Amino acid sequence: MRSTNHIYTTRIEGYLQDTYRFASRGERQSFFTFNYGLRFSHWSFNGETTVSPRASIAMVPAFNNDITFRFSTGLYYQAPFFKEIRDTVTTDGMTRAVLNNKIKSQQSIHFVGAFDYRFKMKKRPYKFSAEAYYKLMHNLIPYNVNNVKITYYGGNQCDGYAAGLDLKLYGEFVPGTDSWVTFSLMSTQQKMNGRWVPMPTDQRYAVNVHFTDYFPGTEKWKMTLRLAIADGLPFGAPHSGLEHQDFRAPAYKRADIGMSYRLYERGYRKSAVKNVWLGIDCLNLFGINNVNSYYWVTDVTDQQYAVPNYLTGRQINVKLSLKL
């Protein structure tokens, strides 16, 4: 089979944006930052013109200057790329691929509320952030994931939503080092053929920890610990369609640990290099078999079995880093 295609399209894009800062009246003032804008585009391939307004406001209240409240909303468009406009149709055993010039950009309306709190504990800086979001989606282009292959349906066939909560505590548990803990909850689904199904990226929860510490009595030796636990992604048998993604992979679990030694520090000397670190990491410390995808095997009775493909097991990594 051989095919030659020539596509000539024109895309015009632009945006307008402004920021307005003001403060409330009174002896104790609250400070506001209002950011608003408009983005527009036109694509000659499908003749679509999109206009997406968006705005955000942040407030530092008078009762505590270490607190920031944020809210943002807007209408967003994601233009389709080549694999999304490619529509494959099989008729009488013949597979035909066409480019869908009637396709539209995927649309999303965002509502995001956030809270930041900066504080000190034992004279060390910390920051706690919380963000809740809801995104209403239209004209979605669904896709199937089979192992590492992604196949798009080639048309706007779904509506959906994404809602979630992200929490993060960031700070210097040890002076001069960065550590954080994050916790996320999410639900993202799409309605296809009258049925709500999870999107391929529907990861319902995730916990991540990054902790750095120095050895007692010296700052030349540094230890880093990383932990991750996340919900497994939905999947189903190949060629069964998104409506039958009724299974979910096991949770992803991983622990990494690393040791670093500072070979050089500039200090007060004149040098282009600030410091040099030599480190060794043990990735996937406990050798957990995390599932990447599934290979489906069919027996003589047409019964299918999912055989897991695993991600990389335990590995040792040596690195040399220079900071200029």
PLM features: residue spans?
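Transmembrane beta-barrel strands of outer-membrane/channel proteins
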Residues: Y36-F40, I57, F71-L75, F115, ...
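Short loop/turn motifs that connect adjacent beta-strands in outer-membrane beta-barrel proteins
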Residues: F22-F32, A62-I67, K120-Y126, P175-G176, ...
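C-terminal beta-signal and adjacent terminal beta-strands/loops
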Residues: G176-S179, A228-P238, Y261-L324
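Residues that define the transmembrane beta-barrel architecture of outer-membrane proteins
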Residues: H6-I12, T49-V51, Q107-F111, D159-A163, ...
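Membrane-embedded beta-barrel scaffold of Gram-negative outer-membrane proteins
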Residues: A62, K102-N156, Y161, L278-L283, ...
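Surface-exposed extracellular loop regions of Gram-negative outer-membrane beta-barrel proteins
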Residues: H6-S44, T50-R54, A58, L169-S187
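Gram-negative outer-membrane beta-barrel transporters
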Residues: S24-R28, Y133-L136, G155-F235
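Transmembrane beta-strands of outer-membrane beta-barrel proteins
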Residues: S30-Y36, P53, I67-F71, F111, ...
